[in-house]
A protein has these predicted regions:
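Loop-helix junctions at membrane interfaces
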Residues: 1-179
Length: 179
């Protein structure tokens, strides 16, 4: 029971970081906010596991919408799917056994960023906007711009930050808990 409560509390901390980060970075635009969100998603899956990462990934788009920085409600399930792809690909790739953990993390960065981009591009740009939403052409183009290559950039930046920060977190964690 203690382990489950601890896992839940630590996941809640990541959700709180996500909410605070989204609110604080909202005025800086999608590149900063999206990169920060992806960083938090990756750190949560790497430090607390897949269940924590998935929980944070699913909460993220809803919180963004409630804060007024997210897109239309109809896009939320697709954003959840994109975040899920990022978290699960990162989780699965980092399970690969290798003598060089940095190579594995870079492979995770590349595959997870590409997976999120592909999921969002086909889910939102190619399916949701043209089939389910009746948007004026200018608004449809704006949505397409937000959910195309920009997502690849923000996922890559968040992943790169995680690649650099994770070793520091691991070192601090080992030092803090071995004394």
């Amino acid at each position: 029971m203690k382990r489950g409560a601890s896992q839940l509390a630590q996941t809640a901390v990541f959700i709180a970081l996500l909410i605070g980060g989204q609110a604080a970075a909202a005025s800086f635009g999608q590149l900063v906010t999206g990169s920060l969100v992806n960083f938090i998603l990756i750190i949560s899956v790497m430090t607390r596991g897949a269940a924590s990462g998935i929980a944070v990934a699913c909460v993220s788009p809803v919180v963004a919408r409630l804060l007024g920085i997210g897109p239309l409600w109809a896009l939320i399930p697709f954003m959840m799917a994109g975040n899920f792809a990022l978290v699960m690909l990162w989780h699965l790739v980092t399970k690969i056994k290798s003598a060089n953990v940095h190579i594995v993390r870079i492979a995770a960065l590349l595959s997870a960023a590409a997976g999120k981009f592909i999921t969002l591009y086909f889910g939102i740009v190619r399916l949701c906007v043209p089939v389910f939403l009746n948007l004026p052409e200018s608004q449809a183009a704006a949505v397409a711009g937000i959910f195309s290559v920009t997502q690849l950039f923000t996922a890559s930046i968040g992943g790169a930050l995680a690649v650099f920060v994770l070793p520091v977190m691991e070192k601090v964690s080992k030092t803090a808990f071995t004394k």
